Swiss-Prot record:
Lineage, broadest ranks: Eukaryota, Fungi, Dikarya, Ascomycota, Saccharomycotina
Disordered, as annotated region: 1-127
Biased composition (Acidic residues): 104-117
Keywords assigned: Nucleus, Ribosome biogenesis, rRNA processing
Family: Belongs to the SLX9 family.
The protein's name: Ribosome biogenesis protein SLX9
Quaternary structure and interacting proteins, as annotated: Interacts with the 35S, 23S and 20S pre-rRNAs and with the U3 snoRNA.
Subcellular location: Nucleus, Nucleolus
InterPro entries with a match to the protein in the record: Slx9-like
One GO term describing the cellular component: nucleolus
GO molecular function: G-quadruplex DNA binding
Length: 210
């Protein structure tokens, strides 16, 4: 029995050694790898820095294109609006330029009238014709806007003041209702209304309310 156990153990050890040697023979260890023939056939990849630099350059190119198309580049929006407003104001006709042009027209007309007067005086010596030939200067009168606003309004028109109460807000509606009630009481106490109600109502409606 003892001899059989020894032989069994020896057989197991020999089998294990044989397996280990077979594995070592199948997978030999190579310290130096051979050259890969496809090592230089891979595609070049862009790094993050290269991508960021490309994006930055394209963004700068777009900005340059916009700046070449627009004269207000590189300034804030409010400054651009101010410049555009100034350009619009410069395009509008100015009062001083209008006055100078009117004065030039008056001078040209007066010079032409004087030439005609001299021509008629040289041709005719009749005093009546000479009096008719005297040129009359055209004078431009400047009227203030206040006088234009004070023109007479037609009957039945309603004049609304700038500081009149507004019916849309609560305070204005309250004030308007108070004014209407006072006006209604005045109409009722009027003698003409008591004698002829419809005629007086018609006259009051035609009157100016404000």
């Amino acid at each position: 029995m003892v001899a059989k156990k020894r032989t069994k153990l020896r057989d197991k050890v020999s089998r294990l050694n044989a397996k280990e040697s077979a594995v070592e023979e199948e997978v030999p260890y190579t310290s130096v790898l051979g050259e890969d023939p496809k090592a230089f056939l891979h595609q070049s990849k862009e790094t993050k820095k290269e991508k960021q630099s490309l994006k930055h350059s394209s963004f700068l190119d777009r900005l340059r294109e916009k700046s070449s198309a627009n004269d207000f580049s590189g300034i804030s929006k409010s400054a651009a609006r101010r410049r555009k407003r100034k350009l619009r104001d410069d395009l509008k006709p100015k009062m001083q330029d209008l006055l100078t042009s009117l004065e030039n027209d008056v001078e040209v007309e007066s010079e032409s009238g004087e030439e005609e007067y001299h021509d008629t005086v040289e041709d005719n010596h009749d005093p009546e014709i000479m009096e008719d030939a005297i040129p009359q200067r055209k004078v431009t009168r400047l009227v203030s806007s206040k006088k234009l606003k004070k023109h007479e309004k037609p009957s039945g028109s309603i004049v609304i003041k700038k500081n009149a109460p507004n019916i849309r807000n609560q305070r204005g509606a309250k004030q308007l209702s108070k004014q209407e009630s006072e006006r209604f009481n005045k109409v009722l106490t009027n003698q003409t209304f008591q004698q002829n109600p419809f005629g007086s109502l018609r006259d009051i409606i035609k009157m100016q309310k404000y």
